[in-house]
Amino acid sequence: MQTDKTMERKPTNKEPTTAGESTRPNVPKATPAQDIHLANRELSFLAFNKRVLALANDQTVPLLERLRFLCISSSNLDEFFEIRVAGIKQKIAGGIDAAGQDGLSPQQELNAITHTAHAFVQEQYETLNDTLLPALAEQDIQFFSRDTWDEAMSAWVKDYFDNNIAPVLSPLGLDPAHPFPRLTNKSLNFIVDLQGVDAFGRDSGFALVRAPRSLPRVIPVPKDICSSEHGYVFLSSIIHSQMGSMFSGMDPVGVYQFKVTRNGDLYVSDEEVANLRRALESELLQRNFGQAVRLEVAANCPPKIIKYLQNQFKLSDIDVYRVNGPVNLNRLVDIPDEIDRPDLKYNAFTPSIAPTFSATFDGSMNIFDYVSQRSPILLHHPYQSYDPVIELVRQAASDPNVLAIKQTLYRTGTQSLFVKYLMEASRAGKDVTVVIELRARFDEEANIHLATLLQDAGIQVVYGVVGFKTHAKMLIVVRREKKKLVKYVHVGTGNLPCDYR
């Protein structure tokens, strides 16, 4: 088988709804030499991501799917800055100025990326504010900003804040005794401009409020106080509205949300490290606190506060992105799944069972006999189901004639059927070996956890070949047949299904 989001001298409930004049910095465009005909890899990715964003503006795409595409474009851009932009900044810091095959030096490349990315971010928020939110409101799906809250909703917000949010917040006044803290990568934070004197008689200044990751970024509004079938408020709006209650005796004259993106790459030398897993575990502890590469801040944040934040994160003007909305659009990604509106989503796709395999799923034939009579077999995913491959591992786990199972795992959650059946096979006394690629980017921690789970089940776990990344999907089942050992092999590409069904 083969598989292929405010300067307010007095706080008001008014929130901006348009970005107004462009706040993008002046960044010189970079033009490659005329005799260079190769596209720049990073600019090519940004062009691809622009096509993703275009789907969020495509009226032929179901509305909730358009929201999902907006979130995907945001997630893509985050990862792009964490890895690609971070790498370019490291080259510049290291004094590397040689042009690449596309004719651009690292600094020219960064200038071109910045110019494109600023325009892209502005388009993202125009898509959200001017297109998607109004269209969702027409479908009785509404995100309520502070200036739209009536008395009942304001009372509910206060109660929700007091009971579900305030207990986990730890406001921090910024002064010589309380310096600017280390903020984790992509976390939601608020910088507060205070006036007055605190309980200890100290003059006010700036304060910081961090929103823990455990808090949901979008909160559904109870239907008895909501004018829409599906009503939501942003966590940032709730915290912003209640900021005065957190600073006794002081007046928050400005509240501004921001997010910092950091270098998220892991640096492990294949030649020097003796234990790849232990080295990755050590690097993972530092991932959330890498060098800052981008600052996203509320569009109406005053320059003095932006400059203060820039100094804290050692960022230049071109690294600052003013946004007119929530600083992490990706946190809207669960909304489409929470709303039961099939008319606003793609129709569910059910892959077909290849005719070659239909008999094995009604218990009429052993899959090994079936495959041996028809091998080789080509399966075309996702149009054809992955079930035959899962069935092969399921039957192998309980077949007394199977002696060994060997499989590669790249991005596979602990709830995968493959993991379930491999553990069953090991407990049944079969020799099970799994190659886990620990360096599957942003899945390293999950894969380390998976490796521990498999080892606890008696499975031999290895971590691939030093210097290479194991991306192919391979499976070998060794079975005794008529006094011979026969191998059943599956080779493919893509990720393995991760859900129990």
Predicted regions and their residues:
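N-terminal localization/anchoring segments of enzymes in phospholipid and broader phosphate metabolism
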Residues: 2-501
